[in-house]
């Protein structure tokens, strides 16, 4: 089990050391190394059983139930500290591969086994989490069969990881091109963010629940923007909401309250919740208003942090006060020829990652049940099936 909160106080955190995991690091099969905080090696050693290593499985037992991830051999760090809402499992690898174990609990059957042990009052939690998990039974094929399933998932994950790495490079390239652009912008005309784009606020989607017979749309909130998709537990809204607050792949979304985020959405059709802007323009290409909004993002984050008495946010006046430099049409066209294809490729890669994830999740239960033989799935042909998702 993770340490009590009182064992890791704010003053324990340092710039580098042993990373501390939280729920945001358990969003997929493998842990991710985003938004980590650190404690000293000495402090980590004092926490004993809260220390997790490569090959360990981490489970959330309080809060966002259903989260379960393993620490891969390729993790950025050798050791991690789990939070007070998590527990660590160290499996007998002569019987079960950690990857296969985690995959099972990501299937509908596995999720049901976890969530059926949820307590019914207060904060969502597993009753007697470690002993409860020890009593769960799962079907285990031979290690060779497990390895086939694991290799199939790894093959998809490698493609997803490659796309993400390409997007990291393309994002850096966009930043470099934008910085170079600013060096020659001395004679350009001035405007504001509100002059170049529309920042459409979402709706309080709890007022627009699906009507009987309407499967609805998932609601895009700040959490979903941060994780890049709408999970199975996302709230839903009616499917005939106004197009102005309907989000499609490639739309630029800016959360202006709470955690300020800016990203191109690639999670499929959704309804835009309040506290997020859908950014569009009839006069300028998406790269232009994206890069200028991003240019001011650090300022917006600082402004939100200064609002200590309320949830951090920015006002629309901040957009009106944010300067934009606009080149003449010929120069803008040249810049667009250089910048827009990069943005388009980033979006294409993000959408492909989502579809690969959906394909993986659809096939995984069939692979684990033996309905599909993993050794007979040709990973090189997966792209031919992405249009089905």
Predicted regions and their residues:
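Amphipathic heptad-repeat alpha-helical coiled-coil/stalk segments that mediate oligomerization
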Residues: 373-389
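Short coil/turn segments at secondary-structure boundaries
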Residues: 7-15, 35, 116-118, 189, ...
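A short glycine-rich beta-alpha junction/loop motif
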Residues: 79-87, 119-150, 270-277, 307-333
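Non-catalytic DNA-recognition/assembly elements of restriction-modification systems
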Residues: 1-9, 135-204, 225-228, 325, ...
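Extended, non-catalytic scaffold segments that flank or surround catalytic motifs
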Residues: 1-29, 98, 103-107, 115-120, ...
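Sequence-specific dsDNA recognition surfaces
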Residues: 1-11, 24-57, 194-209, 216-249, ...
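A short beta-sheet element
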Residues: 22-23, 42-110, 122, 241-298, ...
């Amino acid at each position: 089990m993770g340490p009590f909160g009182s064992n890791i106080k704010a003053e324990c955190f340092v710039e580098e050391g042993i990373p501390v995991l939280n729920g945001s690091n358990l969003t997929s099969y493998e842990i991710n190394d985003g938004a980590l905080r650190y404690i000293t090696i000495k402090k980590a050693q004092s926490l004993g059983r809260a220390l997790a290593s490569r090959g360990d499985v981490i489970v959330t037992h309080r809060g966002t139930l259903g989260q379960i991830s393993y620490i891969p051999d390729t993790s950025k760090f050798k050791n991690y500290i789990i939070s007070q809402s998590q527990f660590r499992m160290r499996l007998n690898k002569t019987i079960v591969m950690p990857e296969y174990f985690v995959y099972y609990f990501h299937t509908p059957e596995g999720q049901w086994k976890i969530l059926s042990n949820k307590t019914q009052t207060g904060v969502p939690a597993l009753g007697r989490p470690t002993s409860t998990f020890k009593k769960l039974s799962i079907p285990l094929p031979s290690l060779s069969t497990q390895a086939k399933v694991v290799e199939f998932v790894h093959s998809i994950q490698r493609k997803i990881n490659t796309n993400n790495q390409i997007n990291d490079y393309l994002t850096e390239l966009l930043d470099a091109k934008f910085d170079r652009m600013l060096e020659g912008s001395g004679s350009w005309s001035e405007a504001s963010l509100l002059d170049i784009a529309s920042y459409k606020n979402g709706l309080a989607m709890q007022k627009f629940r699906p009507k009987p017979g309407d499967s609805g749309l998932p609601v895009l909130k700040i959490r979903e923007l941060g994780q890049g998709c709408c999970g199975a537990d996302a709230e839903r809204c009616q499917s005939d909401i106004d197009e102005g607050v309907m989000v499609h792949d490639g739309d630029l979304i800016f959360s202006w309250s709470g955690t300020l985020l800016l990203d191109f959405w690639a999670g499929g059709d959704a309804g835009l919740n309040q506290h997020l802007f859908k950014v569009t323009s009839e006069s300028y290409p998406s790269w232009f208003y994206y890069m200028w909004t991003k240019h001011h993002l650090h300022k917006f984050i600082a402004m939100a942090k200064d609002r200590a008495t309320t949830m951090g946010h920015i006002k629309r006046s901040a957009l009106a006060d944010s300067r934009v430099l606009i080149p003449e049409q010929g120069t803008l066209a040249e810049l667009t020829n250089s910048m827009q294809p990069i943005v388009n490729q980033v979006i294409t890669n993000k959408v492909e990652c989502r579809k690969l994830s959906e394909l993986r999740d659809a096939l995984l239960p069939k692979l684990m049940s033996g309905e599909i033989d993993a050794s007979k799935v040709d990973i090189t042909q997966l792209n031919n099936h992405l249009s089905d998702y």
